[in-house]
Amino acid sequence: MKRYIALLLALTLLLSGCTAAQQTEKTETSTQTEITEETEETRETVETPEDDNSFGLSYLPEYGLNPYTCTATVNRALFSLLYESLFSISTQFRAEPVLCESYRMIDEGRTYVFTLVEGATFSDGTPLTAEDVEASIQAARSSSYYKFRLSRISYYTTQEDGTLLIQVSTPYENLPLILDIPVVKKESVSEAYPVGTGPYKLQGDRLVRNGHWKQTQEPVLDRDTIELSACGSTGELRDNFEFGSTDLVYCDPNNAASVGYRCDYEVWEVPTTVMHYLGFNLYSGYFANNTLRSAVTYLLDREEIVTEFYGGFALGSSLPCSPYSDLYDAQLAESYDYAPTQFRAALQESGILTSPEYEYHQGIFLVCSDDMVRVETARYIARLLNDAGLNIVVSALDHDTYLKELNDGDFDLYYGETRLTPNFDLSEFFRSDGNLQYGSIKSTSLAELCTAALENTGSFVELCAQVAQEAPICPVVFKSYAVYVTRGKITSLTPTVDNVFHDSASARSLADADKTYENADPTMD
């Protein structure tokens, strides 16, 4: 999604160094929504540098450029220039083959065999092998950013024919969706600046073209050199972008760390899998009542929440899935969308307002004070609940205290954040060893539905329907990140969370690589 903005005014641009790990609270007929919204404002513009072909990027060197350990959002903008992965994930959360030429699914989805693109080479001239991919997966399994998505991978090895074999503990219909992991040379996986196969390579304080790059099309960012500026603070990042030495900034525009700046830019919105949601205590307090709990979704005007508290950089969803994903069912989502009269009817039916048990009850609403967007949103939701007749008090706590209270179960509800996988696997909420089962929401039946949805994506709608009915959680929004670019420096961009310079025009389809049913050996099925 691109928004055109030409203006000279003070803004709150978030150049935060850090993003949340895979589970941020713990350590923490299908309709596709069109992604084409354009708005325009015209005010006084700022002159751009005469050398329109120059391009600069800033980064925070203390975080390095290792894709498995780096948590600096601004640094991750460089990853799609330096590294490639077996698959890339589009803005519609579809897997697109990159370093994978083809693959086969066997053993009813428990085993995958991947064939690499022929002739792919690292920037130092050494050929890419399945052993490099194997080493990259191993590094990712130890990474807070990737490890949860890979938890079901039980075995992987390089085969004699040079292919990569991956086995999973439960059948996967679409394993490529979680394999958008940067691949680096196996000898460099632990280095701060690993060797990759991307269109550029690091050379001193600049990026230069990788002469060994396999792809035939020109990269989205088509420059011979890209100047890098090492920064020690978000203030330096702001100054570099404002005064022209940096032409692109990738950030979470709703992060707590923010700086103001003045410049002329274009901005692209980046859909993410980061979900903000209400979690409930199922065994004490107001929301132990299922009738009330399952009706909270009707009280939430998500469009207003997105506008008022997220500055438009989020997408409301009553389902635990981004509306941009093929898994999203618009008809089901609509049935659980904003309908305040239905909430009030359910509140009356619940008997909460007339029950002596709740006459003096004070409901505790936990939220992490490190994130003011979540705090303000929680306060807004609390006002709605109180206006309806409940007695809710927001308790905004520092991160460590917040997690302790969640683990102790001392709450009625909380406003949480988690980074879901691109296939929107909800298992961490419901399986017995899950990391997000605050409020005793673990559920054998829901965990089984999560597994069924991995095996057959058609089961995801049933999972969403059951989650909405039982309401252990209530999705509110999916966050968006932003790519700010000096006006005129890039004309076309379709950025994704881990591929800022994603090129949708030249992307291959997953069907192009799927050879599961092509000349299949019946003895392997």
Annotate each language-model stretch with its function.
Residues 394-402, 427-489, 519-525:
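Extracytoplasmic/peripheral linker and loop segments enriched in polar/acidic and small residues
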Residues 167, 171-227, 233-235, 512-519, ...:
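Gly/Pro-rich hinge or "lid" segments in bacterial periplasmic/extracellular proteins
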